[in-house]
Design a protein with these regions (language model features):
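Extended alpha-helical interface modules used as scaffolds for assembling large macromolecular complexes
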Residues: 1-144, 148-150, 180-189
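Domain-level recognition of nuclease-like catalytic cores that cleave nucleotide substrates
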Residues: 158, 162-189
Length: 189
């Protein structure tokens, strides 16, 4: 179907990506997404997810915390609300749009341990992002783990691989079971 849409000009294909080629078609697509209730959720999710990425890159931890709390409170069943697996599921949800610009790896071997999330930028100009999650610990402890375990080594490649010189943003995210609050801290590594 996508191939036919490219052939007929409804979509364009460049650098391994399919996109809507002109503003008129994009506006029609936006209208359809906003009018079609079943797609409206996807549209809102994509917008919030993009807002989360932009807040992360801007180190706007207040906006990050608001988005995390809203997603956690509206998307997670109350019985598993305090589960670290659910926090990870919320991270997948709020960072959904990051996959357009980054290759996302979970529980990846990095430095002296396993990093919760690592975002490898597709564009060499974009920074790399390392996320570490903690439940009932501070976000500073998560960030300290990123630094202490040298997770940024993952961006330097293995022996014999080409090293990258990306800027790397470390992000510590925590959830407190008692207060039901999320906290975030960021630091350029």
């Amino acid at each position: 179907i996508f191939s036919a849409m490219v052939v007929y000009g409804f979509l364009s294909y460049e650098d391994g990506k399919v996109r809507i080629p002109n503003k008129e078609l994009m506006n029609k697509f936006d209208d359809m997404i906003q009018k079609e209730e079943s797609l409206g959720y996807v549209y809102r999710l994509a917008k919030e997810s993009e807002r989360m990425l932009q807040a992360t890159l801007a180190e706007d931890t207040q906006v990050m915390e608001e988005i995390l709390e809203y997603a956690h409170n509206t998307e997670t069943p109350i019985l598993s609300y305090n589960n670290e697996t659910e926090l990870s599921a919320i991270i997948n949800l709020v960072y959904l749009s990051v996959r357009d610009k980054y290759r996302v790896e979970r529980e990846d071997k990095a430095g002296k341990g396993f990093v919760d999330y690592i975002f490898y930028p597709e564009n060499k100009k974009d920074p790399g992002i390392i996320l570490e999650l903690k439940v009932d610990h501070s976000p500073r402890e998560a960030l300290k783990q990123i630094v202490d375990k040298d997770y940024k080594l993952k961006f330097q490649g293995k022996i014999g691989e080409i090293k990258t010189d990306h800027k790397i943003l470390g992000v510590g995210i925590s959830y407190d079971k008692k207060t039901k609050k999320h906290s975030c801290v960021t630091q350029w590594l």
